[in-house]
């Protein structure tokens, strides 16, 4: 697993306009990076221009595209010479990669190492977009605003080792958006505001009213 340096993370949050972001532990900074990446990836998810170019097509066509790409590998889907080439998916991947490189320049040196993982992740996101666009509003994405009080019905904490003792019940970062389905909800994943910051055993108490 490749990880960014502390300086790269700090630069990332400065560029994103979030220099005051607080993490309870140093390794929690990865959740901040995930939050910023996902914000770019899911931007305009519910719009017809999600691929970077506006398109207005019948919902049945989108459903057929969903079925087709579900049966195609992400690598084959972006290869113009391949039988199952998907021009819209290819355009979507290029558009999101350009956004990420513009906002997170340190990712450029990783692009070839992460390309296959990136494409596979984008395939799942694109499939979700196609399904949502063809569902007549049955499937929709929802986001949780920062400083919102934690609500367990529609949110879950992203860190599997989360300890309520060290956090306020207040959302600091939306890491992964949630989805409303017809009869259920996929919860949004959030990172809460820490009370205590522990970097290399140096404890700093953080209180916010």
What are these regions (language model features)?
Residues 1-120, 124, 128-143, 149:
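Internal, charge-rich low-complexity segments
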Residues 115-116, 121-128, 141-209:
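Compact beta-sheet-dominated globular domain cores
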């Amino acid at each position: 697993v490749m990880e960014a340096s502390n300086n790269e993370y700090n630069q990332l949050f400065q560029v994103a306009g979030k220099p005051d972001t607080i993490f309870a532990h140093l390794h929690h900074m990865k959740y901040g990076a995930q939050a910023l990446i996902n914000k770019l990836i899911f931007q305009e998810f519910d719009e017809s221009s999600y691929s970077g170019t506006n398109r207005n097509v019948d919902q049945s066509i989108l459903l057929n595209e969903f079925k087709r790409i579900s049966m195609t590998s992400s690598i084959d889907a972006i290869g113009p010479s391949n039988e199952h080439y998907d021009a819209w998916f290819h355009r979507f991947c290029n558009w999101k990669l350009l956004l990420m490189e513009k906002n997170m320049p340190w990712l450029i040196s990783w692009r070839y190492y992460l390309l296959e993982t990136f494409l596979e992740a984008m395939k799942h996101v694109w499939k979700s977009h196609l399904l949502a666009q063809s569902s007549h509003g049955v499937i929709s994405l929802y986001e949780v605003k920062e400083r919102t009080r934690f609500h367990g019905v529609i949110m879950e904490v992203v860190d599997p080792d989360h300890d309520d003792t060290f956090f306020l019940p207040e959302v600091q970062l939306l890491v992964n958006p949630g989805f409303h389905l017809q009869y259920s909800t996929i919860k949004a994943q959030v990172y809460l505001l820490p009370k205590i910051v522990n970097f290399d055993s140096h404890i700093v108490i953080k209180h916010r009213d």
